[in-house]
């Protein structure tokens, strides 16, 4: 659907070109108004054009307004030095809601659907997923849901760490201790720690481990059998967590790209991009002080080689139009070097196809990196289990009479919702403080606030004996609270555009929180049952219900019909 912002931008662009045909193409500065008494949107371009046109901003604003059709607006005002404030008419907002209602059911389809690959979560085999994987998994899943909703073909890739020296250590340790079967990741993690200690202390063990890496790469039957067993145990454990988080992923580990590594290095060499540095093969770039090493001095490959091969495969074989990799911001330099190398090699046709979606750290309430008291990473499964228990405690405190059945059903939904929302509502680039106490609050910018507004609408339906709310209804907007709610609802598609453009889910969480506040004000100020506007107000309730439900689904949150 054409958003209010794009509609207004089109009107202002045409008006500026009619008023000042000598101007070249402009990037307009039109934003939602910062305060309600300024109207719905404001155009700030008159100030920018003052120097170019050598006229006062106010005179420029007057010329622009003179070329804008008045029909969609109840007022167009010039304020201050030359800000143009627009207020849409209530009739126009009502008509736009009808279109919004139809398109909400089908998703706001992108004009040019693309093949989008999102690489996220990506834990390492033989290690527990920890709190660092939480951010990648939640952010990646949200972006995948949003891209899918607007019609893109999304491939969700789990680029698990399933190759390398660690497997040589594990295979050697398993061979020497005659362990035939491993059934749980906890056993595997304990073995990994023991194998790592031996590798650091015992030079002979280290040599045998390195030999097993070579054996694995060469397809040795015993080494491959143990490797497959290790991967199977780990992936089963990962899938348990993905089920709890309601996240879908297609696993394609580092090992998948092994057949292409030598060929990629040879191709880079044929393009004169490779320089020998202390025996290692590196790709240098003028813009960076360090190179991307693609082959070690001993002839071995590393994760950079795999990443280059993966990028090439995703473009050439998967036919990706866009590639997103969701990892912590600490890997930013690596991905800048990766992009530069793939551009130079022609694997990436142009800039803008690849994006590193970086994110900050999770901190404890003291502002330190979130770890156990002993300094180890907090296991993700334990964190999720704790969230569910904390949510149950919160429910009991609010509803002492809650049944065990309700507690068992609602606790996991509230706990997982709270964790996801707390993460997504923080700007992904920033570090954020993890606090169960804050994330489980029933007020403020939390998952509980969204859910409470949704449950309130379900309560309206129950009280009035309605199975569903009207999806089509002639609408007339009268009250300020109705107008504010209508305007906020209509901003949903432009917020979705912004979320996907910036790859930042917090724009969506901020919007949904604002929507709950507008709905709560509407519920307070506008009587529904038995009023002259009952059907129209039920229609607004229905649109709010559907928008909240859709928005929460895009965040990966679940709804409840009552609390």
Swiss-Prot record:
GO BP field: arginyl-tRNA aminoacylation
Q: What EC number(s) does its UniProt record assign?
A: 6.1.1.19
Q: Does the keyword Glycosyltransferase apply?
A: no
Which Gene3D superfamilies does this entry report, sorted A to Z? Arginyl tRNA synthetase N-terminal domain (3.30.1360.70), HUPs (3.40.50.620), Isoleucyl-tRNA Synthetase, Domain 1 (1.10.730.10)
**Any GO CC annotation of this UniProt entry:** cytoplasm
Where can the motif 'HIGH' region be found? 123-133
Give the residue spans that cross the bilayer: none
Query: Which UniProt keywords are present, listed alphabetically?
Result: Aminoacyl-tRNA synthetase, ATP-binding, Cytoplasm, Ligase, Nucleotide-binding, Protein biosynthesis
Localized where? Cytoplasm
Alphabetized GO MF terms: arginine-tRNA ligase activity; ATP binding
| InterPro entries tied to this protein | aa-tRNA-synth_I_CS, Arg-tRNA-ligase, Arg-tRNA-synth_N, Arg-tRNA-synth_N_sf, ArgRS_core, DALR_anticod-bd, Rossmann-like_a/b/a_fold, tRNAsynth_Ia_anticodon-bd
User: What reaction does this enzyme carry out catalytically?
Assistant: tRNA(Arg) + L-arginine + ATP = L-arginyl-tRNA(Arg) + AMP + diphosphate
Predominant place of localization:
cytoplasm
The cross-references to PANTHER family, in alphabetical order and at most eight, read: ARGININE--TRNA LIGASE, CYTOPLASMIC (PTHR11956:SF5), ARGINYL-TRNA SYNTHETASE (PTHR11956)
Complex and partners: Monomer.
Family statement drawn from the similarity comment of this UniProt entry: Belongs to the class-I aminoacyl-tRNA synthetase family.
Q: What is this protein called?
A: Arginine--tRNA ligase
Q: Which organism is it from?
A: Chlamydia trachomatis serovar A (strain ATCC VR-571B / DSM 19440 / HAR-13)
Lineage, opening ranks: Bacteria, Pseudomonadati, Chlamydiota, Chlamydiia, Chlamydiales
